[in-house]
């Protein structure tokens, strides 16, 4: 009896493994697929993909396989990521193909871990999603954002006065996140209470850590903690939405005061849960990009004093023309040419969005290789930005790369591209420049550990030690 049970158990395990192996291999049975390797059944090469990021070198997963499987630096190779066969498109030509074929041959796609952390109804990613995105893009247009520069300036000044002044040493990354999250809450939700903002930020941080984790929902795992935090966060954002609906009905809030009011007055009967999912997404994107860029700008300005001096000189000239207590304006931002070149070079070396996925909605060929319908596609900003064909001596920090006409089209993609390009890129530009202005006019700084440059991508890039610095006020 015991041997029979053991035999049945072992047989079921073997049959399951054979099924998984057969299913895994069936994805790659087409003719003329891109070169590459598929890794292990089910997990594919996901662990290698995640590991390279957590070691601060996300481009290595791509560049190693480009050298091994592709004759040039632009092309396509196959792999298997997050449970799906995946084609990785490389170089400016790959980026252009994906970005210009959005909603024709490819659509946006997220791994299952993201979908479980951010559950959505069918309408969230179809008609309502498109409508919400259009509304957000209207809010994020440069002409619409101009009136918010003074608010950004006010929030930045208060942040540096309360959390940096009188400090001798601090850790940059968490403070950068706190600042940019405060700006996002103020402009998107009209939320200005520091205690309430801090509580919401803690929820967001707990959610983000599990986005690209292994999707095993067991107690104690990062994925499980992220799912729990996501539920609590969604509940809080739904409460904010419900409160705003009442304020709009009672005339205590206006349709023009922030993104939330603008959406509520424009989308009709959209469910609060769907609105909450969308708001959570734009709040993550609305502060993480600027927080990451600001952190690494501070890092590189500490490493290159001559660049810091040139940025300081540019910002001093702007400050000199301002009256006391006068806020920054659009005309001031337009004068920050070199400061923006510095920010662009920082985002080349450390792109806030290291890459992203698409899904093939039809069969197509690229560079002579067949890509089946249903395959996932990945583009890499880090690999493109470190390609010497586009950026000579790519590891060298050189802001002057962005003088004149700048890089080749589709070779510089910190905000993605095509219809799915980050709608908040102009918002991020204004916020980054406002922060630089307030920062360099107040402080000089140095790194506590000058030779420590470890970067961890999990899922977004950040300094391994948070970037501790010593600060020295100008006055």
Curated annotation (Swiss-Prot):
- Return the InterPro entries for the record: Cyt_P450, Cyt_P450_CS, Cyt_P450_E_grp-I, Cyt_P450_sf
Any single GO molecular-function term of the entry would be: oxidoreductase activity, acting on paired donors, with incorporation or reduction of molecular oxygen, reduced flavin or flavoprotein as one donor, and incorporation of one atom of oxygen
Q: Which GO terms describe its biological process?
A: saponin metabolic process; sterol metabolic process
Could you confirm whether the keyword DNA damage appears in this record? Answer: no
Segments spanning the bilayer are 2-22
Membrane topology category: Single-pass membrane protein
A Pfam family annotated for this chain is p450
Required cofactor names:
heme
Q: What is its EC number?
A: 1.14.14.126
Entry's Gene Ontology cellular component terms? membrane
Q: Which residues bind heme?
A: 422
Q: What class of enzyme is it?
A: oxidoreductase
Q: Which reaction does it catalyse?
A: beta-amyrin + 3 reduced [NADPH--hemoprotein reductase] + 3 O2 = oleanolate + 3 oxidized [NADPH--hemoprotein reductase] + 4 H2O + 4 H(+)
Q: What is its main location?
A: membrane
Q: Which UniProt keywords apply?
A: Heme, Iron, Membrane, Metal-binding, Monooxygenase, Oxidoreductase, Transmembrane, Transmembrane helix
Q: What subcellular compartments does it reside in?
A: Membrane
State the family it belongs to: Belongs to the cytochrome P450 family.
Name recorded for this polypeptide: Beta-amyrin 28-monooxygenase
What species was this sequence derived from?
Barbarea vulgaris (Yellow rocket)
């Amino acid at each position: 009896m015991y041997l029979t049970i053991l035999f049945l158990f072992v047989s079921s395990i073997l049959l399951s493994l054979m099924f998984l192996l057969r299913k895994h291999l069936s994805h790659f049975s087409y003719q003329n697929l891109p070169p590459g390797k598929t890794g292990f059944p089910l997990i594919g090469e996901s662990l290698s993909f995640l590991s390279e990021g957590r070691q601060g070198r996300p481009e290595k997963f791509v560049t190693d396989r480009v050298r091994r499987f592709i004759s040039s630096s632009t092309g396509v190779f196959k792999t298997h990521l997050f449970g799906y066969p995946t084609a990785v498109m490389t170089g400016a030509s790959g980026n252009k193909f994906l970005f210009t074929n959005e909603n024709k041959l490819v659509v946006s796609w997220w791994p299952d871990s993201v979908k479980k952390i951010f559950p959505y109804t069918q309408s969230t990613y179809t008609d309502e999603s498109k409508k919400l995105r259009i509304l957000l893009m209207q809010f994020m247009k440069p002409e619409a954002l101009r009136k918010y520069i003074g608010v950004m300036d006010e929030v930045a000044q208060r942040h540096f006065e309360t959390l940096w002044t009188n400090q001798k040493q601090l850790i940059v990354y968490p403070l950068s996140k706190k600042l940019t999250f405060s700006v996002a809450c103020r402009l998107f939700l009209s939320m200005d209470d520091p205690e309430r903002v801090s509580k919401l930020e803690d929820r967001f941080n707990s959610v983000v850590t599990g986005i690209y984790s292994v999707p095993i929902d067991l107690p104690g795992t990062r994925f499980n903690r992220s799912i729990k935090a996501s539920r609590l966060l969604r509940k809080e954002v739904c409460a904010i939405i419900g409160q705003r609906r009442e304020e709009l009905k009672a005339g205590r809030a206006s349709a023009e005061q922030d993104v939330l009011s603008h959406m509520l007055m424009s989308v009709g009967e959209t469910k609060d849960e769907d609105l909450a999912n969308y708001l959570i997404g734009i709040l993550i994107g609305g502060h993480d990009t600027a927080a990451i860029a600001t952190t690494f700008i501070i890092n590189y300005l500490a490493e290159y004093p001559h660049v810091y001096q040139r940025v300081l000189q540019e910002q001093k000239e702007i400050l000199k023309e301002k009256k006391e207590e006068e806020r920054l304006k659009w005309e001031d931002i337009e004068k920050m040419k070199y400061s923006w070149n510095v920010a662009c070079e920082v985002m080349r070396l450390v792109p806030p969005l290291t890459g992203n996925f698409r899904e093939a909605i039809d069969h197509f060929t690229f560079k002579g290789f067949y890509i089946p319908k249903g395959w996932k596609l990945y583009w890499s900003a880090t690999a493109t930005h470190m390609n010497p064909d586009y950026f000579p001596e790519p590891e060298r920090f050189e802001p002057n790369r962005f003088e004149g006409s700048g890089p080749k089209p589709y070779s510089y993609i910190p905000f993605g591209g095509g219809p799915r390009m980050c709608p908040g890129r102009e918002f991020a530009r204004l916020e980054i420049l406002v922060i630089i202005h307030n920062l360099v006019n107040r402080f000089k700084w140095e790194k506590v550990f000058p030779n420590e440059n470890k970067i961890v991508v999990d899922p977004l890039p950040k300094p391994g030690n948070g970037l501790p610095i010593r600060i020295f006020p100008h006055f």
